[in-house]
Amino acid sequence: MLKTVNILNKRAKFEYEIIDRYTAGMVLTGTEIKSIRLGKANIAESFCEFQGDELFVINSHIEEYLFGHQYNHKPKSERKLLLNKRELKGLLKDVQNKGLTIIPLRLFTNEKGMAKLDIALCKGKKTFDKRETIKDRDNKRDLDRIKKEF
């Protein structure tokens, strides 16, 4: 049984309003998948962008594999995402017409050891929206604390 890896983009839910979620496969080299299985990746500042009809994740950081030597990959290269044609067309339409953004939420390996990326169609939050999120979270925490006392 393979150990599953789960790398999160923790700021995504705070900075964006998530509209829709998708799970995409990734085109990776051998040293990239080995680094991901070791948990040496970061998707905190990454985003997705269309180049033609294909979707790429940009600015994701996958550390070089320690034993890769001359065949190692570039840590910040663009990586192609694999989705159904129908899903790609829908995402492209939403990004072009509605001005939405696609960001990665989670990088993980499934039970077969394949690397997958959970992406989300999002709308950026304004500063006052972020303040509301903080207030709501604090109010919920206070209510839970009061309920626990009784």
Swiss-Prot record:
Pfam families according to UniProt: SmpB
Q: Which GO terms describe its biological process?
A: trans-translation
Q: Which domain of life is it from?
A: Bacteria
Q: Where in the cell is it found?
A: Cytoplasm
- InterPro entries this protein is in? SmpB, SsrA-bd_prot, SsrA-bd_prot_CS
Answer whether the UniProt record assigns the keyword Cytoplasm to this protein. Answer: yes
Enumerate the GO terms in the molecular function aspect.
RNA binding
Keywords assigned: Cytoplasm, RNA-binding
| Predominant subcellular localization, coarse grouping | cytoplasm
Q: Name one GO cellular component term.
A: cytosol
**Keyword RNA-binding recorded:** yes
What is the annotated role of this protein in its UniProt record?
Required for rescue of stalled ribosomes mediated by trans-translation. Binds to transfer-messenger RNA (tmRNA), required for stable association of tmRNA with ribosomes. tmRNA and SmpB together mimic tRNA shape, replacing the anticodon stem-loop with SmpB. tmRNA is encoded by the ssrA gene; the 2 termini fold to resemble tRNA(Ala) and it encodes a 'tag peptide', a short internal open reading frame. During trans-translation Ala-aminoacylated tmRNA acts like a tRNA, entering the A-site of stalled ribosomes, displacing the stalled mRNA.
What family, per the record? Answer: Belongs to the SmpB family.
Could you tell me which NCBIfam families the record lists for this protein? PRK05422.1, smpB
Which PANTHER family did the record assign? Answer: SSRA-BINDING PROTEIN (PTHR30308:SF2), TMRNA-BINDING COMPONENT OF TRANS-TRANSLATION TAGGING COMPLEX (PTHR30308)
The protein here is known as SsrA-binding protein
Organism of derivation: Flavobacterium psychrophilum (strain ATCC 49511 / DSM 21280 / CIP 103535 / JIP02/86)
The UniProt gene name for this protein comes to smpB
